[in-house]
Amino acid sequence: VLFPSEGFSLATLITKTYTKRKQQRSDCMNYTGYLRQPHYYETDQMGIIHHSNYIRWFEEARVDWLTFLDVPYYKIEEAGIIIPVLAVTCDYKEMIRYEDQVRIEVTIDHYTGTRLEFSYHIYNQTTENLLTTGTSKHCFLDKETNRLLQLRRSHPEIHRIFSETFERQKETTND
């Protein structure tokens, strides 16, 4: 018994944790987005967020979202996988200022088991105005050999999480 006073065994704790995380993954559409308060140093001379910071914000949001799905980057890297960026786009709709709190929503636009494409939507948390959109394209490589991986074969659990999340998001988009 791990916590004797509470009557929890290690097996019960593991089962509850697994069930909770499985529910989180199945509720991927309940992810409320990554909240970000811009920092003063991210502004330019005009008092708006410098364009180079948006790509960093995309990465922060992507890392946060993957953690929510219970596949944080450190677990992916521990599994011997790296996910290099192949391409990035960013379309600026409205300026973001230092005092604006933003919400970044992340979705999987495309997934093949070897490649992955994310889309990003940045909203003003107060007004709900869409401020920026973007995408990033990635592939999965073996950390040691830098060879392309097919997750379905090499890491079926990680593949399942990405595949199921992609399918759920696709269904929601088509509704």
Residues covered by each model-derived region:
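Hydrophobic beta-strand-centered segment that forms part of the acyl-chain substrate-binding groove
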Residues: 65-116
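Short, Lys/Arg-enriched N-terminal segments with co-localized hydrophobic residues
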Residues: 16-28
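HotDog/MaoC-like acyl-thioester-processing domains
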Residues: 32-34, 97-98, 109-175
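Catalytic strand-loop segment that frames the active site of acyl-thioester-processing enzymes
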Residues: 29-68
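Hydrophobic residues in beta-strands and at strand termini
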Residues: 36-40, 92, 140
